Amino acid sequence: RSSDLPVVEIGKVVVEAKNITVNNRFGVKKVDGISFEIREGEVLGVAGVEGSGQTELIEALTGLDKIESGEFILNGKNLTNLKGLNQSVEKIAHIPEDRHKRAAIAEFDISENFALGQHGNRYKKGLGLLNFDKILSEAKKYIEKYDVRPIDPKLIFGKLSGGNQQKIIVARELEKENIFIIAAQPTRGVDIGAIEFIHKMILEEKKKGKAIMVVSSELTEILNLSDRIAVMCAGKISGILNREEATEEKIGILMAGGKISE
C-alpha cells in the first residue's frame, strides 16, 4: 500500500489545530479538545464512525461554524473565528461532504458551477462584472483535464452522473489557489473509475506540497491516501497512526474508543 503513495518531502507545518472545541446549535459539545498538525506534502486522514464530530470540525475550519475554544492556525495566521472567513482569500480548498447541499447548484450549468465561490477575484473583469468568456474557457480546460463526460460546459449540472458531478467540484476546488485542502467524503456515491481518478488528483496535489485533510467513512480510502491517520470517537481523537502501522483492525478499535496495545 505505502508504495502507491508518491514520494514527497514533507515540509513545514501548514495547519495547526490547538485544543479545538466546537458545540452544535443546541450547545452540545461535538468536537472536544482536538489537536493536530498537517505539514506541506502530507495527507492526514480522519477516520471515524459518522457523527463522531468530523462534520463539525470541518465546518469550524472552513468558517461555517464557531470554534468554542482553541485555535486554528493556517500558515502562521490565526484564523480562529475570523469574521467572514473567505476560503479563497485564505487559500483553503474545500470539497464538502454533501455536494448537493454545499457544493453545487443543480440547475446551473457546468461552467457556472466551476465559478461558484470564486466570483470575488478570479473571474472579475471590472465594474463587478463576471468574465463569462474566461469562465467558459476554463470550464472547457478542466472538463478535459478531469475527464468530465459529456464535454459540453453548458450542460445542466443536475443532469450529470454522480461521478461527473463530483469531478467538477474536485476540479473547482483543486484548481483554485490553495495551501490547505479539506476533502470530505470525496468519493461518496461515485463509480469506481471516478474514485480512482479523484484519488489520483488528490495525490497530485500532495506532490505539489499541499497540506491535505481527507475525511472519509471508507477505511480503504483513508488507508490508500494518508500519511497519518487520526481516528475520531465521540468528538475526540482516540489515536493517530502512521500509515505503516495502520490496519483496518487498529482503526476499528480506535473508532470504538478502545486502546491499542503496543
Where are these regions (language model features)?
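Glycine-rich phosphate-binding loops of nucleotide-dependent enzymes
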Residues: 1-262
